[in-house]
Amino acid sequence: MAEFSADLCLFDLDGTIVSTTVAAEKAWTKLCYEYGVDPSELFKHSHGARTQEVLRRFFPKLDDTDNKGVLALEKDIAHSYLDTVSLIPGAENLLLSLDVDTETQKKLPERKWAIVTSGSPYLAFSWFETILKNVGKPKVFITGFDVKNGKPDPEGYSRARDLLRQDLQLTGKQDLKYVVFEDAPVGIKAGKAMGAITVGITSSYDKSVLFDAGADYVVCDLTQVSVVKNNENGIVIQVNNPLTRA
């Protein structure tokens, strides 16, 4: 068991909160066959990357003017393969627990967590209208369309951090601590580059890959992560039976 404190929590979405790997791979494979691209080669580079970056790299002839290529693919993921999408175990409970003061059991006035995803707004927002409806979309929500540089660049996480600090009136507070939850090496690297504690989830990659990327803790899923204290002074997070390199 391990415990650490944090002021703000930042979450990746696909593979961290929502299990979308099967849906995404089916949609990408379909597109690969249409354009004669080797899916296995694409999958070496697609996870955690922005859709528009993958399209530019592997489908240079596809028309992505005004992101219409991105939207077409991600609508396919959201609708054609919705039956393969599920929540990462423990995700809903963890997010809901971050909304409650552990001392008073009352809902906090402002959320201390945000989403930072490489996906498009259409796809990312859709999960909060379906399988994450009970949680509801957070105010601070950074998508792949909101940043110039995708992960492993820390731009997305840094932007979410700054917006949360502004919303929570923490801009003048020094030595704030942050935690990033991620399933992809590029996301772990982005979190570390921002100076955050990083928790890797092995939904998409082996634990060794996440440790090599710099993960401070690695878990199988979010049932191993719980909030033991949450109030105006910060958050204390407990990681139960974290995985080890051995």
Curated annotation (Swiss-Prot):
The active site is at residue 83. It is an enzyme of class 3 (hydrolase). InterPro entries: HAD-like_sf, HAD-like_SPP, HAD-SF_hydro_IA, HAD_sf, PGP-like_dom2. Its cofactor is Mg(2+). GO terms for biological process: carbohydrate metabolic process; glucose metabolic process. Keywords: Hydrolase, Magnesium, Metal-binding. It catalyses: 2-deoxy-D-glucose 6-phosphate + H2O = 2-deoxy-D-glucose + phosphate. Mg(2+) binds at residues 83, 183. SUPFAM superfamilies: HAD-like (SSF56784). Its EC number is 3.1.3.68. Substrate binds at residues 83, 92, 146-149. The keyword Secreted does not apply. Optimum temperature is 30 degrees Celsius. One of its GO terms (molecular function) is metal ion binding. It holds the Pfam family Hydrolase. Optimum pH is 6. Phosphatase that is active on 2-deoxy-D-glucose 6-phosphate (2-DOG-6P), as well as on fructose-1-P. Belongs to the HAD-like hydrolase superfamily. DOG/GPP family. Present with 752 molecules/cell in log phase SD medium. This is 2-deoxyglucose-6-phosphate phosphatase 1. It comes from Saccharomyces cerevisiae (strain ATCC 204508 / S288c). The lineage of its organism: Eukaryota, Fungi, Dikarya, Ascomycota, Saccharomycotina.
